[in-house]
């Protein structure tokens, strides 16, 4: 076949006669940016917008929390059974710290890791899953109801930061221990110790026997579900929770190994 005949029979020649576009398979079209770069620019813009809105929202919440009046927390000290954390044995404070907020003495009102987990859980499940420090729980118990929402969690977080700026750690711990529900209409740790064990958390008191390590661990383990965990008829789940608490107290050096072993032995009698 002659060269002219081959040219006439080629697809390119036929496409020209039919007014069809001829596509160059050797070169990329000029003037159109690659899709990947375009997608990156869109993502970057969306990210900048998100960061701006987030920063604006956080700034507004921080401003509002800075105006919050947390002086009212001092009224907790007016309770007749109030006992300051300064007057409690270290293992009493340790029982609650090791169970509820291991980093209590290190953070400034909220724990970044725990709070981030809780906030993302809130967004995904429409619910709040843990993450609250002792300071946040103190704020929630005093200022807010049991509403579970993203907005309430943020308010709690920033007011907790204000509380940390205004009060010492022992003051905050005192507020917490004297304003949580222990079950059976008991709202201070002293009244709970009196009611359940006939003991006192005040290490300077001679009127009653001092609360034991095990009793402290029981109360600290109970506040998570005070209406469910029954001290007079302990479930296996409750006992396991108490054992976990005692282990944490030993690991964090709030109690010695001998105190730990003694408490475990006493727990078997329940």
Swiss-Prot record:
Compositional bias annotation for Basic and acidic residues: 11-21
Subcellular location field: Cell membrane
Transmembrane domains' residue ranges: 42-62
Pfam families, per database record: Transgly
Keyword DNA damage: no
Main enzyme class: transferase
Pathways involved: Cell wall biogenesis; peptidoglycan biosynthesis
Entry EC number(s): 2.4.99.28
Family named by the database record: Belongs to the glycosyltransferase 51 family.
HAMAP family linked to this entry: MGT
Protein name, per record: Monofunctional glycosyltransferase
Organism per entry: Staphylococcus haemolyticus (strain JCSC1435)
């Amino acid at each position: 076949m002659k060269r002219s005949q081959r040219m006439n029979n080629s697809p390119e020649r036929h496409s020209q006669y039919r007014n069809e576009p001829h596509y160059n398979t050797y070169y990329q079209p000029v003037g159109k940016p690659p899709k990947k770069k375009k997608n990156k620019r869109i993502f970057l813009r969306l990210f900048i917008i998100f960061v701006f809105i987030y920063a604006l929202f956080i700034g507004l919440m921080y401003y509002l929390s800075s105006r919050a009046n947390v002086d009212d927390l001092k009224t907790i000290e007016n309770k007749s059974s109030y006992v300051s954390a300064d007057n409690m044995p270290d293992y009493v404070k340790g029982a609650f710290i090791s169970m509820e907020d291991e980093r209590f003495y290190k953070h400034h009102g909220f724990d970044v890791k725990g709070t981030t987990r809780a906030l993302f859980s809130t967004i995904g499940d429409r619910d709040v899953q843990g993450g609250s420090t002792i300071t946040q729980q103190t704020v929630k118990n005093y200022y807010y109801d049991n509403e579970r929402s993203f907005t309430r969690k943020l308010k709690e977080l920033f007011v907790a930061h204000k509380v940390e700026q205004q009060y010492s750690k022992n003051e905050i711990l005192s507020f917490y221990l004297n304003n949580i529900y222990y079950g059976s209409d008991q709202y201070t740790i002293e009244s709970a110790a009196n009611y359940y064990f006939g003991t006192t958390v005040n290490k300077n008191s001679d009127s009653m026997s001092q609360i034991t390590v095990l009793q402290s661990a029981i109360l600290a383990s109970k506040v998570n579900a005070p209406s469910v965990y029954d001290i007079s008829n302990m479930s296996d789940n409750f006992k396991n929770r108490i054992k976990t608490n005692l282990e944490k107290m030993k690991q964090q050096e709030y109690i010695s190994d001998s105190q730990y072993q003694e408490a475990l032995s006493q727990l078997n009698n329940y």
